[in-house]
């Protein structure tokens, strides 16, 4: 009984989801560890930075008087000047003779260019003077003599040992400046002032005690703290959007989840995590050097509130994104960008404080303002304490308040955006929904509140809708009226549903049928509220599905199993069920009981502790269904619930749904008509979004069915013509459906049911016709569907392309031989014309073309290679620019008062102050003050002797009286780099002013261009060479690892079975990979040498690099091919190997260079070892040796290191490795590559003798089925027969396979798992044998052995006319057809290119291929998909392509492993018709495996059922039905006016005809019975009696059907259930308890 509607509390759901989120975090260890360690890592890094860059506290420093101006500093000075004029010569003459006669040597240069050129070869005592005019000049010292920076103000730390500002005094710059100034003054005034200028003294200004704060580490600390908290928001956003992307959030909402609970569960989890992390980080930060004076509680509050706001910030972003991979990147990027905005606010002193708080809604900015305030309080107060929350420029109390408000704002915005932003799934509210009264006052609705009038009137009943019986009137649970749904795709509108109207009733199971894309899932999504209808109306118990609030009430009754599996991957089956049971509101004390019941009902106890991501496809569907039925919901909406399940599991599900049908509404969609036929009470067929019909099985079959199906199992002596004549004699309208050596099938129309008894009686009498047994079954629902949907389309298709027989209409115009020439793929007559070498060349070119196309279209690999190239080029360009910018970094500095002194009207600046003027004379200095006024220099008079008291000032001037004129003392601030020469310039200009000269002397300091030292050049070049080696080794896996992908998708197996020669495969890839790698490597090497043209070039030694490169490229490519055979289970093989290659190259460089310090011999040993053992190293070693050998000044002592000696091994080893890799590649190809169909002309080692295998006789099994035993003896006889006219195409004899499964590691005990047990069967040419069995029965093992992927333990296999391990020429089977279960298709290759590749591999010419492609695409309806890449194809089209590829080349043997998996009924019919047609010519054979019995019945001539690795039965479908079938099923539909008394009489009559008949659940208009086999002695008598009853009683129609193959299958698989519980729990008789109108009884 359905459970009543539950009201689930928000808090309970929150606690449940909190547990779920906690478990998810615990099991996604990678992200969880990052969330914990990332902040701590950054915190410890910041502590390290703060320890390395502490605030520098300087004690008070008194004035320091420098030694007098010393002319001896300029001893041996070479002074070059330009231009050479009378004036300049006169000036320099006075300097060299009058002022500095003993120390100067002057040189003349015609131009500055000559002067600069000469400086390159001059020693460091060379100084240049460049006159601009007589009053202006440049002094050019070498950079190591004077400061070169353009920064005018240095830090206090810069003067701790040697002061840049004092360099101008110690280097002789000011002495030379004074000398030239004196010469200019003398030239202008004829007055010599050299003695006064020479007497000038210099004093370093004293400084007060100060704390100096370094801005750079402070900025790093600020931005790092912002980034430290980013993992919380990053991973939270990814988790939430990932759940949205998988539809998990909407899935939870369908089960009644409150939005509040969803948000709260994540918020509480991350609040707890951030609380703990913030507390830990605050304690560490305050206990270390980061914030040592602050209160840990205050720091904790700041960290915690920021972490919380960053979490809400991430929540706010989640509604804006549909892909989890995007939201994480954007969240991190936005965090960093806003962090830098905050950094700008904090560090830019001129930023207006009034605007600072405008950025506080950005939590990153608010946090940075708070951290900056903490640092300020640490620097100038006692730290951030509660008592100082309101102090400082940006009070902390405001920051904390703003962070709290930010969290609230982000939370509200997240909820709002989640409600209004349209997503892919779910209903959305209007943008102003919170202003509507209805949102705040929700009234609950009753079930039946909506009347007929509310839903556009009653739905009209017509001929396509079967009226329901009276007992269902008024039980309409789901009402659908005029539903329409349209989607917008690019520029067109796609209508998914078109005016759909019908009712779904309580107490019934309703099936939605239709091909893929017909609108079934869309209707399901509308009913559960995942998407709103475009038009029309639907209600669930009166709740409108398009209204969010009403849908919330309806969802409390709904259990849903969507088409895609809905579960939490990292949780176990039991945890998934328990958590979702709690979400649904099942009482806590009943959850364990309910979960255990679901586990038992669906036979999932054995997997209850398995994580969902580790389940098979069928097990995941069981879990999804188990979630849907939890708590007995009143409404079940199931979208393809049994997809991917084996028959045993399907029957378990059917039993469960039938058992829970009463008082409940069950709606399911399916592609399997038998499932709908058996399970559903009413079926709604939808086509192109429109309703085709609604009704019961008997209504649909009688109205649209083709009738009964008569199947006769015949012997080899059967007179088929006489038999057909007998059938048509009784039933003229009978039609032949199928005929082969063992079975004949006719269709018998409904209208002739009264003649059935006569026909069956005649068959019983004429036993001499060769009919061993016969049976009858009613038309299937599949037939009805196809008649309604696609029969005409299927019949019109041309399947003759798959057979050697021409189409009927072509027979007149073309002979069979002509068709063979134009349509057959590599026919026998043409095969001899294609030599092995010609085919080899064709295959090489084909593989090369395919490989090139794959690389071209696989954007990920191309992007990776381009990115690596760009990284290398970017590093080169960056270092080149740095090199040249450093080279030209010297800028002229004009030494004028404006640098450091304020003008009138200027605002104070950090390095501009007024000039302190101290009068140490006994008189006034008005003329000096007038000079400063005339020069626009603001002065401040100073009378104290302690300059510290007047700090900070850029400089001061102390005036001392001398005999003739003033003598000055220049007092300069050591942090003002250019203040001393500026003061000297002021003094010189004062003397000019005093002598009535209005011009002023101008001076520039322009150091010579600084050349990069040789050691820097060497290190730079070495670094780039090492980088080249590391980056280039990372590239080959991205384009040479395709083999790993081909093995994963089994494309390589498919190619080998198609006749691909292994050597052609590898050479075809190498033809592309080697030139590509060579070009890339040449570009990188070319750029390396182009950017370093100054390298000393040794052509002979460079040839060694070239020779190394020639062999290195193929060596690395071949090694990569070998590596592709390993680590096949790694998800991203290319990325893994790229990382391994790069790390290995880096490690080699590191080891060789580190051991350099241990001695040259050790380095050489490692170099030689790496060259020999590591194939990616030789070029790197060769290149580094060449570069080191090209350096100048290599010592030439006896024991010196000579890099040229290391070149030889690096050059030779790649050549030797190439040979080794070729042999290893052959070895791995033989070991892991699978069986080759053709002999390889190059890889001859692959054609070795096969291993000797044992062929023991199977143990005697007395219970072995007689047909299985007969098949074994038949195979044995055929194997020993040397003169048989025609052997079967496939023979399998005593095939046995065991696997060793190591269970106990400690005791090393091994358990043996038997996959197949001495299986024997054969498949004749022209026959299709169906291999059936549950999961684990051994079907896939047999297929894998046949294709060569698995070696059998014992047994023999013969394919075509040769054994699988024969060494004879195999031209008879040039290729084998193979359609594997997983699609072996390349995602970036088009459908047409697949045909061309496989056609060329099989030896087809391009002309033949065009014709074949045209006909195949027409036959299988593939024309519109020809130019689409595989990744854009629907699943059904992919399966068609796999089948078509398996049939190319006219293979004698074809293996079809579940060929129609994932197809809708229309596509399956196309496939089945093509398969049947392909094998009519009697020259091919096929082995087909399947889970679906209807496929076996439709396609197979014989069926073999495997259970637990053994063959249990084999024979035709009819033979197995007759032999193993348990009974029949009878359905009777009564006329509406029949009375209860007559129904009782009819029931007694049925009991009389069939004494052991068991009545199933029935309704007033339909009676259903299961009839044991023993009650049906003769079909003719049974039909005769039923016809009498039809005329006697008010029976409108009836159906009487035999058991299907499905029943036989389930009966036999019960044995496997008993052995290993791989199937579900079934009842003892395996007779499914049928309820209303199911064709088959189980």
From Swiss-Prot:
One Pfam family recorded for the sequence: ABC_tran
**Where does the source fall among the domains of life?**
Eukaryota
Give the stretches traversing the membrane. Answer: 32-52, 220-240, 264-284, 297-317, 327-347, 355-375, 396-416, 866-886, 967-987, 1021-1041, 1071-1091, 1102-1122, 1139-1159, 1164-1184, 1207-1227
Return the broad EC class. Answer: translocase
Q: Where in the cell is it found?
A: Lysosome membrane; Late endosome membrane; Golgi apparatus membrane; Cell membrane
Q: How is it modified after translation?
A: N-glycosylated.
Task: Name a single GO cellular component.
Answer: late endosome membrane
List the SUPFAM superfamilies: P-loop containing nucleoside triphosphate hydrolases (SSF52540)
Which reaction does this chain catalyze? cholesterol(in) + ATP + H2O = cholesterol(out) + ADP + phosphate + H(+)
Q: Which residues form a coiled coil?
A: none
Residue ranges annotated for the ABC transporter domain, each copy included: 478-713, 1290-1533
The record's comment on protein family reads: Belongs to the ABC transporter superfamily. ABCA family.
| Function statement | Cholesterol efflux transporter in macrophages that is responsible for APOAI/high-density lipoproteins (HDL) formation at the plasma membrane under high cholesterol levels and participates in reverse cholesterol transport. May play a role in the processing of autolysosomes.
Q: What is this protein called?
A: Cholesterol transporter ABCA5
Gene that produces this protein:
Abca5
